[in-house]
Amino acid sequence: MKRICLILSILFSISWYVGAQNIPVPLNYERLYDFLDELITDGAITAQTAVRPYSRQQVAQMLKQAQMMDTTLDNRQKKDLAFYLNEFALERDTMVNAYVQYTDHQTYNLSLADPQFSYKSGNNSFKMRLRPILGADVTINKKGALLQRWWGAELQMDIANHLSIWGSLRDNSWSGNWLSEKYFHTDIERIHGARIHYGASQAHPALSNMPGVQYKEANYGGDFSDSKGGISLYTWWGSIGIQRENIRWGDSYHASNILSGRNPAVPMITLQLTPCRWFQLDYFHAWLVSNVLDSTYFYLENTTKEGALAKNYRPYNKFMAANMFTFTPIRQLSFSLGNSIIYAENTIQAAYLIPIAFYKSLDHLLTKGIASQNQNSQAFASISIRPINHLHLYGSFYLDEFKLSRLKKSNPEHNPISYLVGLNWSGWPVRGLSLKAEFMRSYIACYTHSIDVLTYASNSYNMGHYMGDNAQSIYTELAYRPMRGMLLKLSYTNDVKYNSYAYLRVYRGPDGVIRDGGIGETIAEKPFDHAIYRNDALRLDGMYEVHPNMYLTLSLEYNNAQGFDNQKTDALPSEDLGDAQHYLDTFCPLYYHGKNFTTSIAFSFGF
């Protein structure tokens, strides 16, 4: 171990000077990512888009690249560029220039208009940024009003241009006190009505693209906190660290089908290597949240003075290892290949700490000798093509299992895969205008598993596309950027969930006899056959970034969420049968049942 640390120290000590920070830029910094995507699609800068979030170091480099190409930018883009160059001033070894500030222009800056405190030492060996976080959102439709509020703070530090440390806390609440008694008759119904991240049944997360949360107890609605952060050792060619952040793998402007970043963030060891312009390696080993109780692992709690004990069961351990190799042979083409494994052992399996590995092969080595059931492995790919400036074509593919024999017409089985394709036309003939379209399909059993603890999920949120198995999603967006800091979006989303199946290898029949579950029969069922849930949403979003990380937003949305009966008599044992209300309650929050016109107004700074 001492030798490894010595080698790392030598490698980082002889590296080139880097005056930036390896701190991730949150995926929900929508305006910044939209601006970077615009510059990339217009051909002003070059960057891979399959793996996010970007670090502040990477973003600063992109902005510098755009600054060198400013003759290709229009006036609005130049103003946006100057705006973000100021936001990333510390990464460029300068001080932030604020409207209302107390500063010496060299080492410290206390900004009041866009609240934050920035500091850097005279030789740039130490940099720090401290920001408050505060926001509120009022959402109203015919079912009443929801009030969301959040507050907290974030701290970012960089030491010796090679060590980044950061952390943040956001306390959130969704209040159902103003929900209509016509739709929510009791206090418990109002609590459930405010918990819009879950279906009305509160059994599973809803099929929506909202970031996932884990609710705490609250007698007014939904309450949760989110603490993120990490520590990273970095240089110009790579970084290694441990962090708790949301990540997204796979090219997408709406929702990725590989790793969407929708599930609550999990702690992970991360490695990123970029030794040359045309190659990038990303790897992580994560501690997932199984939400599956281990009947052999519990705490004993004293419940009476006499010493009576109660068992408090603990969840199973659940881990994930994944890698992604991104190649950019020419500026117009980038493709990524990777694989991952979900495993549940008492401790970390050292084999899955290897960054460059095919994990399914390692799984066979570790489990086949005792004829044990495999862990859950996956493979995936993403491709990005920019044949001309202003046009981006992309696709991503997720494979849970693949057999060539299933491609034959004589074989009724379908490979459990998911694919996504899309395009982005931006900046021509009207500057600032873009058109996006995205289509996704996921086949039966591509994200599920017969062992609950091995599903492709964390905190019960599917880590791939939010629609899950046997589903289809169509997303279109027309966006316009009329002035610095403003983004207007008109979007339409059509989400359809088809027949829902459990992954059963065996099942117990009505007579009590254990029978083959017929997974082969399940994946031989016709995919996309009978819709059981559908949600259509037409949405207009207006967003204005007054100062960096300070937003005013207005959203108008019409949605129509419907369930459909599926009570056939010849169904497989694995199929979930029910009436329209059952599916609507399972997949949709009660607040969005049926037809709704919803208005949302929000203000925030620091997200």
How should these model regions be labeled?
Residues 224, 328-607:
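Exposed, low-structure sequence patches enriched in small/polar residues
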Residues 10, 69, 288-297, 495-497, ...:
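Short regulatory "switch" loops immediately downstream of catalytic or recognition motifs
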Residues 31-34, 38, 58-65, 83:
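Extracytoplasmic/secreted proteins, especially bacterial periplasmic and envelope-associated proteins
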Residues 10, 16-17, 204-206, 295-312, ...:
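Intrinsically disordered, low-complexity coil segments
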Residues 22-42:
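Short N-terminal segments immediately surrounding and downstream of signal-peptide cleavage
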Residues 1-23, 607:
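Bacterial Sec-dependent N-terminal signal peptides
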Residues 23, 45-50, 55-57, 67-334, ...:
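Outer-membrane beta-barrel channel domains
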Residues 36, 228, 475:
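Generic structural marker for isolated residues within well-ordered, non-membrane alpha-helices
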